[in-house]
Amino acid sequence: KKFFFIAALIFSCIITNAQNVGSSPEYIKLLTPDWKGERFADGRPKVSDAILERLKNISIEEAWGVLRNKGFQNQFESDWEIINPGEAMTGRVVTAQYMPLRPDFEKQVKAQGKIENRAQQGGTNSWPIDILTPGDVYVADGYGKIADGTLIGDNLGNSIYAKSQRGVIFYGSVRDQQGLSKIAGFNGWILGA
């Protein structure tokens, strides 16, 4: 009896610790409680297009000054490689975080993705692209991985732009930057290119 109780307890802990691949609207709202405006169905704050357009006209220094004055001291990272440095990019973010690929972990992530009706063809790096809407910027943490860790090339870059009319901010690497730079309107801030 004791063995079955312990086995049942361990099994229930595994089940309760299972995580969704994507964040629920409730979790996103929990992380953004100060937002009082409209939200998307997925819970993200719906910053107006008018504000996004106004933000294109301010400098990095101005934005950084406002953030620091509001108590956001850790929101700046330098040394980005910008695909089109003369073009401003603003948008609402869709975030993703990647860890170095492990076959055992990938199997579990793909199984959970199947439960969440995510595409099973190709890699998981297409999943955030699938949910982009006009005005979104795809922000991904790839742990700065360069070798065997590119998140997109120009094919996925075209898909990102078709869905969002924006671009990407990646702490990681991309391939075919020349092809990405030829996508009219697309931009990317890459740290680890």
List PLM regions with ranges:
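Short, well-ordered, mixed-charge alpha-helical segments that flank or form enzyme active sites
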Residues: 146-149, 176-180
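N-terminal low-complexity or amphipathic/hydrophobic leaders
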Residues: 46-119, 123
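Bacterial Sec-dependent N-terminal signal peptides
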Residues: 1-19
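Phosphate/pyrophosphate-binding betaalpha-module
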Residues: 169-174, 180-193
